[in-house]
């Protein structure tokens, strides 16, 4: 059976910064309040005419500039996003059109903040099955376009960015060690953006086109769910927390991550996040954290890393990987 590993990374964030001081002028909040509750200091915001596909394309360009091989033989593009430019066509098709790779599949994944880890899980399966050889897994979000800037509990959280990872066949070294998935569809009404249907689980939805979140309930679900799945994932791989070099959870909220780490045997000091300077970027947060660690010289080849994406659905995917770069 073929093996798969991550061989390249690229990221992009818009130049405009929205700081806590800026938010103080928009809603009744303060830098102290935001930092104390979320750990966030700023987030990036796309321009009016800049959309998710534009950010994804820039992230792939960044990856391409750092990758020693060619991307002309990419045979699948997977884009994780909740803020696609259009209902259809997919954002993945817009990325394909820009780069002109005609012999490639292209599809979007809508798993909110778990989108990147779902994409990596699928890429691993497609490659190890022998169906594909080189897959671009991209995460892109322009959450600012669906954020209600009159709601101080949510508008302080979200930012825009994109990231890309290249997953390739490798006959020698497996880069994916184990995975776990789970879904709690009965929690679909605590984090959503309404569409054609105006109710879920018997709950009437707010049809404003903006994100709606019950932050307290999302926090409780994540803090309750992730620690147990963290342990289950290590057990599936026959590893312990002592074998783990880095933990990279979805950067939803630094206080949430601290709460999760308190319930695991893994120290917060070995947890990688992107929340302080990028806010909650949904599916993008994990790849941003990885790239920050690469650039800082923290993340090194063959280190064992646990990725855990969780979010609206409610759904999650955890992956144990061996870093391939």
From Swiss-Prot:
Disulfide bonds: none annotated. Its main location: cytoplasm. GO terms for biological process: fatty acid biosynthetic process; secondary metabolite biosynthetic process. One of its GO terms (molecular function) is beta-ketoacyl-acyl-carrier-protein synthase III activity. The active site is at 113, 250, 280. It comes from the Bacteria. It is found in: Cytoplasm. Pathway: Lipid metabolism; fatty acid biosynthesis. GO terms for cellular component: cytoplasm. The keyword Lipid metabolism applies. Keywords: Acyltransferase, Cytoplasm, Fatty acid biosynthesis, Fatty acid metabolism, Lipid biosynthesis, Lipid metabolism, Multifunctional enzyme, Transferase. Homodimer. Catalyzes the condensation reaction of fatty acid synthesis by the addition to an acyl acceptor of two carbons from malonyl-ACP. Catalyzes the first condensation reaction which initiates fatty acid synthesis and may therefore play a role in governing the total rate of fatty acid production. Possesses both acetoacetyl-ACP synthase and acetyl transacylase activities. Has some substrate specificity for branched chain acyl-CoA, determining the biosynthesis of branched-chain of fatty acids instead of straight-chain. Belongs to the thiolase-like superfamily. FabH family. HAMAP family: FabH. This is Beta-ketoacyl-[acyl-carrier-protein] synthase III 2. The lineage of its organism: Bacteria, Bacillati, Bacillota, Bacilli, Bacillales. The gene is fabHB.
């Amino acid at each position: 059976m073929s093996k798969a590993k991550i061989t390249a990374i690229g990221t992009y964030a818009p130049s405009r910064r929205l700081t806590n001081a800026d938010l103080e002028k928009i809603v009744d909040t303060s830098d102290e309040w935001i930092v104390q509750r979320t750990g966030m200091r700023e987030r990036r915001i796309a321009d009016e005419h800049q959309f998710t596909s534009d950010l994804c394309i820039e992230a792939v360009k960044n990856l391409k500039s750092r990758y020693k091989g060619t991307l002309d033989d990419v045979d699948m593009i997977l884009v994780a996003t909740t803020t696609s430019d259009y209902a259809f066509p997919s954002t993945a098709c817009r990325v394909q059109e820009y780069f002109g790779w005609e012999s490639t599949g292209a599809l979007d994944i809508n798993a909110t903040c778990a989108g990147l880890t779902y994409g990596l899980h699928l890429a691993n399966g497609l490659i190890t099955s022998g169906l594909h050889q080189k897959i671009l897994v991209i995460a892109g979000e322009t959450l600012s376009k669906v954020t209600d800037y009159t709601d101080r509990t949510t508008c302080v959280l979200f930012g825009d960015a994109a990231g890309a990872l290249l997953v390739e066949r490798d006959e020698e070294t497996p880069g994916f060690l184990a995975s776990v998935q789970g879904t709690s569809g009965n929690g679909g009404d605590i984090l959503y953006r309404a569409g054609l249907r105006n109710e879920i689980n018997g709950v009437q939805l707010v049809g404003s086109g903006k994100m709606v979140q019950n932050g307290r309930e999302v926090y409780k679900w994540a803090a309750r769910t992730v620690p147990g799945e963290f342990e289950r994932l290590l057990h599936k791989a026959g590893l312990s927390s002592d074998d783990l070099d880095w933990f990279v959870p979805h950067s939803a909220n630094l206080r949430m991550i601290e709460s999760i780490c308190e319930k695991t045997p893994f120290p917060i000091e070995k947890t990688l996040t992107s929340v302080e300077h990028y806010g909650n970027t949904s599916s993008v947060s994990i790849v941003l954290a990885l790239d920050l660690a690469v650039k800082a010289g923290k993340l090194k080849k063959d280190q064992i890393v646990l990725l855990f994406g969780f979010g609206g659905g409610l759904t999650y995917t955890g992956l144990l990987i061996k870093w391939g770069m």
